[in-house]
Design a protein with these regions (language model features):
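Gly/Pro-rich hinge or "lid" segments in bacterial periplasmic/extracellular proteins
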Residues: 167, 171-227, 233-235, 512-519, ...
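Extracytoplasmic/peripheral linker and loop segments enriched in polar/acidic and small residues
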Residues: 394-402, 427-489, 519-525
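Structural transition elements
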Residues: 314-352, 373-374
Length: 525
């Protein structure tokens, strides 16, 4: 999604160094929504540098450029220039083959065999092998950013024919969706600046073209050199972008760390899998009542929440899935969308307002004070609940205290954040060893539905329907990140969370690589 903005005014641009790990609270007929919204404002513009072909990027060197350990959002903008992965994930959360030429699914989805693109080479001239991919997966399994998505991978090895074999503990219909992991040379996986196969390579304080790059099309960012500026603070990042030495900034525009700046830019919105949601205590307090709990979704005007508290950089969803994903069912989502009269009817039916048990009850609403967007949103939701007749008090706590209270179960509800996988696997909420089962929401039946949805994506709608009915959680929004670019420096961009310079025009389809049913050996099925 691109928004055109030409203006000279003070803004709150978030150049935060850090993003949340895979589970941020713990350590923490299908309709596709069109992604084409354009708005325009015209005010006084700022002159751009005469050398329109120059391009600069800033980064925070203390975080390095290792894709498995780096948590600096601004640094991750460089990853799609330096590294490639077996698959890339589009803005519609579809897997697109990159370093994978083809693959086969066997053993009813428990085993995958991947064939690499022929002739792919690292920037130092050494050929890419399945052993490099194997080493990259191993590094990712130890990474807070990737490890949860890979938890079901039980075995992987390089085969004699040079292919990569991956086995999973439960059948996967679409394993490529979680394999958008940067691949680096196996000898460099632990280095701060690993060797990759991307269109550029690091050379001193600049990026230069990788002469060994396999792809035939020109990269989205088509420059011979890209100047890098090492920064020690978000203030330096702001100054570099404002005064022209940096032409692109990738950030979470709703992060707590923010700086103001003045410049002329274009901005692209980046859909993410980061979900903000209400979690409930199922065994004490107001929301132990299922009738009330399952009706909270009707009280939430998500469009207003997105506008008022997220500055438009989020997408409301009553389902635990981004509306941009093929898994999203618009008809089901609509049935659980904003309908305040239905909430009030359910509140009356619940008997909460007339029950002596709740006459003096004070409901505790936990939220992490490190994130003011979540705090303000929680306060807004609390006002709605109180206006309806409940007695809710927001308790905004520092991160460590917040997690302790969640683990102790001392709450009625909380406003949480988690980074879901691109296939929107909800298992961490419901399986017995899950990391997000605050409020005793673990559920054998829901965990089984999560597994069924991995095996057959058609089961995801049933999972969403059951989650909405039982309401252990209530999705509110999916966050968006932003790519700010000096006006005129890039004309076309379709950025994704881990591929800022994603090129949708030249992307291959997953069907192009799927050879599961092509000349299949019946003895392997």
């Amino acid at each position: 999604m691109k928004r055109y903005i030409a203006l000279l005014l003070a803004l709150t641009l978030l150049l935060s160094g850090c993003t949340a790990a895979q589970q941020t609270e713990k350590t923490e007929t299908s309709t596709q929504t069109e992604i084409t919204e354009e708005t325009e404002e015209t005010r006084e513009t700022v002159e751009t540098p005469e050398d329109d072909n120059s391009f600069g990027l800033s980064y925070l060197p203390e975080y390095g450029l290792n894709p498995y350990t780096c948590t600096a959002t601004v640094n991750r903008a460089l990853f799609s220039l330096l590294y490639e992965s077996l698959f890339s994930i589009s803005t519609q959360f579809r897997a697109e083959p990159v370093l994978c030429e083809s693959y086969r699914m066997i053993d009813e989805g428990r085993t995958y065999v991947f064939t690499l693109v022929e002739g792919a080479t690292f920037s130092d001239g050494t050929p890419l092998t399945a052993e490099d991919v194997e080493a990259s997966i191993q590094a990712a399994r130890s990474s807070s950013y990737y490890k949860f998505r890979l938890s079901r991978i039980s075995y992987y090895t390089t085969q004699e024919d040079g292919t990569l074999l991956i086995q999973v503990s439960t059948p996967y219909e679409n394993l490529p969706l979680i394999l958008d992991i940067p691949v680096v040379k196996k000898e460099s996986v632990s280095e701060a600046y690993p060797v990759g196969t991307g269109p550029y390579k690091l050379q001193g304080d600049r990026l230069v073209r990788n002469g060994h790059w396999k792809q035939t099309q020109e990269p989205v960012l088509d420059r011979d050199t890209i100047e890098l500026s090492a920064c020690g603070s978000t203030g330096e990042l702001r100054d570099n972008f404002e005064f022209g030495s940096t032409d692109l900034v990738y950030c979470d525009p709703n992060n707590a760390a923010s700086v103001g700046y003045r410049c002329d830019y274009e901005v692209w919105e980046v859909p993410t899998t980061v979900m903000h949601y209400l979690g409930f205590n199922l065994y004490s307090g107001y929301f132990a009542n299922n009738t009330l709990r399952s009706a909270v979704t009707y009280l939430l005007d998500r469009e207003e929440i997105v506008t008022e508290f997220y500055g438009g950089f989020a997408l409301g969803s009553s389902l635990p899935c981004s509306p941009y994903s093929d898994l999203y069912d618009a008809q089901l989502a609509e049935s659980y969308d904003y309908a305040p009269t239905q909430f009030r009817a359910a509140l009356q039916e619940s008997g909460i307002l007339t029950s002596p048990e709740y006459e003096y009850h004070q409901g505790i609403f936990l939220v992490c004070s490190d994130d003011m967007v979540r705090v303000e949103t929680a306060r807004y939701i609390a006002r709605l609940l109180n206006d309806a007749g409940l007695n809710i008090v927001v308790s905004a706590l520092d991160h460590d205290t917040y997690l302790k209270e969640l683990n102790d179960g001392d709450f009625d509800l909380y406003y949480g954040e988690t980074r879901l996988t691109p296939n929107f696997d909800l298992s961490e909420f419901f399986r017995s060893d899950g990391n997000l089962q605050y409020g005793s929401i673990k559920s054998t039946s829901l965990a089984e539905l999560c597994t069924a949805a991995l095996e057959n994506t058609g089961s995801f709608v049933e999972l969403c329907a059951q989650v909405a009915q039982e309401a252990p959680i209530c999705p509110v929004v999916f966050k968006s990140y932003a790519v700010y670019v000096t006006r005129g420096k890039i004309t076309s961009l379709t950025p994704t969370v881990d591929n800022v310079f994603h090129d949708s025009a030249s992307a291959r389809s997953l069907a192009d690589a799927d050879k599961t049913y092509e000349n299949a050996d019946p003895t392997m099925d």
